[in-house]
Amino acid sequence: MQAAAISVRCNGPMGDEKAMKIYSFGEETKPAILLLPGTCCHWKRNFGHVIPLLQEHFYVLCTSYDGFDETEDSTFPNMLIETAKLENYIQKNLGGQLFAAYGCSLGGSFVGLMVQRKKIHIRHGILGSSDLDQGSSFGTWAMAKAMTPLLGKMLRSGKLPVWAKKKMEEKAGAEYAQAMLQLFGCSAATQELPSMAFVSNTSIFNQFFSDMVTPLEDDIYVSGTKIHCFYAVKMGEEYENRYRRHFVDPDIRYHAMQHEELLACYPEQWVEEVLASCRLDGRGMEENDFEERHFTEAERAQAEITESGNPRKPEGEDGKKMLERMNESHHNVTGWALSLWEIQGNDNILDIGCGGGAALSRMAEH
């Protein structure tokens, strides 16, 4: 996995002009996807196993947050400064247009902030099991103060306390627990899975605290942008409700899994979901022009009435001819199927769409 490291700097008066690295992979002629790691995660641990798969379809850009890159002497400042650096990179290198952004957990907050701020345009914003937690400044400060030394010790040792690991395995399963610990930095360090011992407590605190106190608006909407949420159902319904509260008409993709289990344990399926979200045909090009459509209540009501009355039914003389051709096709295909399979009286027939099951049922009766 070869990468070109690109340092980006922050525009504006926010006081942090230190470089942040973005690693690039693949052909620049392909649609660009920006990957954003989760809380206290190294970009290689978070996305190293899926970057080669993504390269077949995308020009891959992987963010390495300040304070979480072993090649840089830096500290994570806050969410808004890091967001400004990302926007600066997209403006300078991609003309302000980004095809897709995937945010793992905390990274989903960055996706939401960039869409909300409207300084650049993202065509497909994807949130990976992001919890989008927000809290009061004092309560969050106290929580961050308590959590920072624990997280710091865990990253420096590369181990989770035995009792905590056992509890995690009992709750979510050993395979998932191991995959998440590896992603988070709690496993043996290798060239592909760097040690996280270099991360300072200041960076941990700043990232944890600023993520929870940086406001994400409700009903975020930008024309030409579609938000996709990989919803891990086992996290609970409250997270689906948050996605629907913060974003107008998000594309909720349901997975009967734990937090980021799809990315951690099933990389091939995860890539397929990313491609499906971006409406790619597997060759790096969109199958159809992307259109954003928001319906009024009257339009939704009419759509429900139309749906109940079979909106696909052709009308008129041309429609009659179309139905005749469709029925002939069904008859030919199902006749071939029946020649291979002798249906018994107690067999169940699965309707796989377009009237195929109904045609099988009619022919089986004869």
Describe each region flagged by the PLM.
Residues 328-347:
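Conserved alpha-helix/loop element of class I SAM-dependent methyltransferases that forms part
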Residues 356-366:
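Conserved SAM-binding loop of SAM-dependent methyltransferases across substrates and taxa
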Residues 257-269:
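Catalytic histidine-centered segment of alpha/beta-hydrolase-like enzymes
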Residues 25-70:
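Conserved HGGG/HGGXW glycine-rich cap/lid loop of the alpha/beta-hydrolase fold
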Residues 125-155:
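Flexible "cap/lid" loop of the alpha/beta hydrolase fold
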Residues 199-242:
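Conserved serine/cysteine hydrolase catalytic core
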Residues 99-136:
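Conserved hydrolase catalytic core segment
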Residues 62-99:
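Active-site loop/oxyanion-hole signature of alpha/beta-hydrolase fold enzymes
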